[in-house]
């Protein structure tokens, strides 16, 4: 999955909007004003990443803490969330090593984790089209 496919998939989630509150280099994706993903191009100088993000688009995704650790163990391109709570967020490096379906599943899970914390009325309106 490349950055264009990722962005398209993110924006296809019900009521998702994109904004750039951290500047033009970081796209933030929110549902009902709650962030569930960011997308940015790694520069290689990100502290604590050993240059893994260099030249690759990366998505920060919310994740169940136990699954977050498991995904990091399985995929070298999944690291603790850069600039995020490392217990509940992963950074997925879009370097082609993770199957597209798996990246989509991680995006879906992030979206659903955020939606599940919303009031029931909001949850119902968001999940109705699914």
Describe the role of every protein-language-model region:
Residues 1-130:
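Charge-dense, helix-prone N-terminal extensions
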């Amino acid at each position: 999955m490349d950055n264009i496919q990722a962005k398209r998939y993110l924006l296809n989630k019900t009521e998702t909007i994109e904004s750039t509150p951290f500047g033009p280099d970081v796209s933030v994706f929110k549902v009902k004003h709650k962030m569930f993903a960011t997308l940015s191009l790694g520069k290689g100088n990100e502290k604590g990443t050993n240059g893994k993000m260099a030249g690759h688009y990366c998505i920060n995704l919310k994740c169940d803490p136990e699954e977050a650790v498991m995904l990091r163990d399985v995929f070298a391109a999944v690291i603790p969330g850069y600039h995020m709570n490392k217990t509940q967020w992963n950074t997925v490096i879009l370097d082609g090593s993770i199957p597209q379906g798996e990246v989509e599943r991680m995006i879906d899970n992030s979206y659903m984790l955020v939606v599940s914390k919303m009031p029931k009325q909001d949850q119902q309106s968001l999940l109705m089209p699914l």
